[in-house]
């Protein structure tokens, strides 16, 4: 018996020791490395961090941590608790290489981690930034970037995938490494996140894209590239840098930085009703939508135990509801939609819509209730009816008061209807302006600034357009114009006819002398019929065309904010004896004085411009015996943007697309426009709205500059003093920021026009909001190289987009550059055949300024 007691006591002692050992094992500290970087440079600040953790089941105890280098104590820290973190910092020297140890212990045990640190000398050579091969003198032992690297920027929507290529020329004998970094554009790659590091085994040769540049590099060099697949996040802007370096630092490093712009207006989101209540037995459509292109959407019916507060969403117990399709269920490109027929109570619950590609989800609470005829009355509180009744009473009372006000206003205004007779005055401040518009002076067309173009030292000033009222009359008697406005539409029509007949009796013939002016009228009727304005326009014998020889058809060519353009037929106009088709501009019924002012100014500027094969030609005016009409030559193929878009698969609606635009054809179009702008510059004209939509395509496919609604005649520059709707994506920085316009600001717009031509009608800065364009331009962002543009054409675009206007070419220089490019392009000579097949492409076009910016 005593022996059994002894065995039990020994067993209890042994179990106590085992429990003590297991507790010590459970409660000894564990260490974790936070930093794993082992290779450092001198002068860098080394940061080593280790973290100690004790099991939460243990009591808090004293933790001690010590740092050693090669067994020499560096520092220590003591804390009471279950966690401890300690960071060791030091600015490095070469002798700081060695074995660093983090040692931690408590009464239950200890742990340690080791860092084997290698410190090397800081780089003492320069990192070349954007060192692009440009044809200048080269050195043998240098890395050069491919010339087309300077053309690569990206503007995308969130979650777009981009494939970037870092292309470069390298000596054959060098082993290279290419590192890709992502960082803020306000900082450099030193503090960036390393995305990938390519060794020599992942760097490929790129012979095809480098073939034309092999003559510019040393014989012992090779063309290589490294690529990165990058998915853009929802950040507005980030930069990606590729760093090229040799393994042994035998040559200078080279790097290039890509800018990635993400349109914040396209942040991904889901639309899923947060709650819905439906009646038992009815049909219900559950729909989830997103703005993400080509999405994968799921709709789940959530398990009742689902906890929305849990940061990790588990759907294992939920039902994938979107698979329960019947014949009426459907899934479109950007939505998941399910029609549930004959709803019952089993459908009540919570539903979750999620996007497979992104961590986005929305939850709907669906309630199925039993409905009856008196359900609404029984379920809605009386207070709701009282609130609704109160608001209905307020609305009815407001309507009654408003009706009384209108009745009173009409009674007062009925005594105030009157007619206003106005005259349009064109004042010529410059003594030479009339000789300009009469074509009696000779001008140079190969220079730009107006000071060298004027026939004498006097500045060329545009005419001043004034509109002044002549009489305000309340009676219509004894030949005076004015009558109380009748209240019925029939009376209004009769009054209008009476005014026309009365005014016909006051027609003055347009004299033939330069100083002979007679006035006629134009009729404006306001939209409210409360007054009429009678406009009298100056008559110019040189441009006046008999109204009876002009026939206007019903074919509308375009319509703007205050004007319309119709096709017409003119007899004996200009030097043509046969009837020809023309375009006729006219005012709409509801125009204002400001519209008349702008219309007449555009008409006067077209007189001043004169004739050039690449500028739309003014043929005549009808200012007498009827409404104002402006006659210009007809461009049967519409505007250039629609013309080139007909060959672009993204825009063309034609089932049959004949032929393709060659580089030679597109360069020829660009050359014609440059010649037209050279001529306008010689006439002291700044266009201010040069774009593909304002270039018309003539009968023989000649380019014609048109739409002079924003055009001004200037002496060196014109400063806009007022704000208005402007084509900001085509405007130069100084025009946007300083409202300063010169011929060089037209050169900037010409560069954008070139980009439109060679992209076959794409919109510039397509993913960027107009208000953000200015800031991006100031940061150096440019439209990417079009696929159809060669290296020389894109260089010309970039030259036109120089931030400093002094660094841009003038139009005469652009003409010379394009002639040189066309002579070197080896295209098949089938341009005329191709054009003859395009007759089916005659498109309607707007001859006026568009209603909104594209």
Swiss-Prot record:
Task: Please state the span of the N-terminal signal peptide per the UniProt entry.
Answer: 1-20
Give the enzyme's EC designation.
Answer: 2.7.10.1
* Catalytic reaction annotation: L-tyrosyl-[protein] + ATP = O-phospho-L-tyrosyl-[protein] + ADP + H(+)
Residue stretches spanning the membrane: 384-404
Q: Biological process GO annotation list?
A: cell surface receptor protein tyrosine kinase signaling pathway
Protein task: Receptor for basic fibroblast growth factor.
Per its record, how is this protein called by name? Fibroblast growth factor receptor 1
- Please name the taxonomic classification of the source: Eukaryota, Metazoa, Spiralia, Lophotrochozoa, Platyhelminthes
